[in-house]
Amino acid sequence: VAARALLALVIVAGALVLAGCDASSIGRDPTTEGTTSILGRRAWVILTTDGGRRLVTRRSVRIERGDTALDVLSQVADVRLAPDGTIAQVNGEGGGALRTFGPEQAAWYFRVDGIESLGVRPDRFRVQPGQSIWWDLRRYDIYERLPVAVGTFPEPLFSGWRSDPRPLRIAHGADFQEDAEYFRDSIFERLDPDVVSIAGDGGVAGIGGEDAGGASDETDLPVAVRLGRANFIIGRWEELRLDPNLLDINLDSRFYGLTTFIAGTTIVRQDPDMEFTEELRDAEGLVWAATTDGEPDGTLAFVVTGITDEGVHAAARALRSGACQFYLACAVDRDGRVIR
């Protein structure tokens, strides 16, 4: 009997480990994920290079009270520190590759639940159970900052900046109400978000459709972004670009840390390791995330868009399936295949 009980315990523990390693974390409750009576307090550690283009490892690790971002990194990799306490190498990689005119400017950055933690020392950031700590080795001469990534969806829409969530608002274009309601019901049900049409939210003229005056300012301009909210937006770019916040982000991609964007009727990409932009000829759909002021604690805009209806639907499918994991932004063809 004792042997059977022990075997049952091992099977249960094994099942929990496998469940914790499921590639798709969509729809999980981030307040309890990774914390069980058998496995203890846990967090995810992700290790990539070049803005997520190369996945090195992804592991669920046990954490103790007081563990920092540096502590959990040390559980999955060999970490070497510089004399000033910054990270010099991880698994022997650090700094930039040697080029004709010297080494590239590159460093290790970490993000928490998809939001980059600039100015926060990793040996002082205390990790909480269920959090995702994503370390990436990337160049910093092209993008000074990359505030938000889509690769840990549905974060940061659940947890927000430093576990300070904001009310979720889902806005959709004219032909994407069903998609918006699907995300609400299957992924964000616990948050009970508003679902509104970007053309019919009663918005008025002003920055991002925010109230800027009396009745004389009323307009039919689409209202995709509300300041002070977590905004999940789905629709064709020709509709979404009428929102001033989204248009500004798309036009000044380097300032806002947007590595893939729409130029005219083409989706283009410039990852942190790319000197020049690249046209993605087969891309029709795109998922990107940013903040309205370029700061990690700013108003979040998480955008599912495209240059065709088919592209928008394909981007939504890719996001739901987990195909966009570990990407800063995610471009797809009309069949939902991620363009690497």
Segments (PLM) and residue ranges:
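Solvent-exposed alpha-helical segments and adjacent loops
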Residues: S24, R126-R340
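Hydrophobic, secondary-structure "cap" segments at the distal end of domains
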Residues: L70-V120, R124-F125
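Bacterial lipoprotein signal-peptidase II cleavage site
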Residues: D22-D29
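OB-fold ssDNA-binding interfaces and closely related basic DNA-contact patches used
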Residues: G51-V61, D67-R80
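Eukaryote-biased recognition of intrinsically disordered, low-complexity regulatory segments
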Residues: T36-R59, P165-R166
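Bacterial N-terminal signal peptides that target proteins for export
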Residues: V1-A8
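A structural motif detector for short, solvent-exposed N-terminal "entry" segments of globular domains
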Residues: P30-G34, R62-E64
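C-terminal motif of bacterial Sec signal peptides marking the signal peptidase cleavage site
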Residues: L18-G20
